[in-house]
Amino acid sequence: MPFSLSNKVALVTGSSRGLGRGVAMALGKAGAKVCLNYLNNSEAAEKTLQDLRDEGIHAAMFRADASDQSQLNFMVEAIEDKFGSLDILVPNATPDQPQKPIEDYDADFYRQMYDFFVMSPFMLAQAVLPGMKKRKRGRIINITSEVFHCSVPEFSAYVAAKGGQIGWSRSMANELAPFGITVNTVAPGWIPTERHENDPEDAKNEYLKTIPIGRWGTPEDVGNAVVYYSSDEASFVTGQTLCVNGGRTPW
């Protein structure tokens, strides 16, 4: 089967719902054992866990704050103790992303964006790399966003942090390539999930008009991109960004 992830173990942070859930489901359907991560919404995490198991997927869930190094280290140790390895890392956890003028942001909010999108992948990588280097194989796929490529106004904290995440991924791709570890990014467009339930309908309609393919993307679309990057078929692909946005950024 192409893109088979049989016997691989994957961790997706922020995977109780939304894009993270879609990524977790796609990895599981490709054969991976899936480790869910959540912080507050245990009910949603339990539902996703049960949905995975209903599909015959070997899955477990772990509570940890994606911005806390000690909790991340403990989670990775628990996963490796339970499954014996951790082959695929998908940093996906995200805080709220309010859109507002730069004068209305404060420094703490900027730091929070940086903590989630640069520091969290860095801390997770430090935790998983010893095992990946020992096995001479690993996949790190950061979930970024099209906002960096589109220069969205009034999103400066989010755009800056996502730009840092992409730059970090490119540097790590070169550093880790000799060890058989690839580092890539998936950059979704605006994909309506639970997070966007209260977004204005007129804004959604205007955005939809800008998608050349003419439909909304889904969490499954993002998950399929992650499955590709996780596979052996993508072993010669590293340091790249795949925009999953229906052709909005064809460059």
Segments and roles (model prediction):
Residues V9, S16-G18:
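Conserved glycine-rich cofactor-binding loop
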Residues G84, A177, T182, V237-G239, ...:
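Short, small/polar-rich loop/turn modules that mediate ligand/substrate recognition or access, typified
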Residues T94, K100-I102, D106-Y114, H196, ...:
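Substrate-binding pocket helix/loop in short-chain dehydrogenase/reductase
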Residues Q99, C150, K209, V227, ...:
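Short C-terminal tail/terminal secondary-structure segment
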Residues E103-F122, R137, I141, Y158, ...:
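Catalytic Tyr-X3-Lys loop
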Residues A125, A161, S169:
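Active-site helix of classical SDR
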Residues P130, N174-P178, S235:
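Alpha-helical segment proximal to the catalytic Tyr-Lys
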Residues S145:
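Residue(s) in the substrate-gating loop at a strand-loop-helix junction
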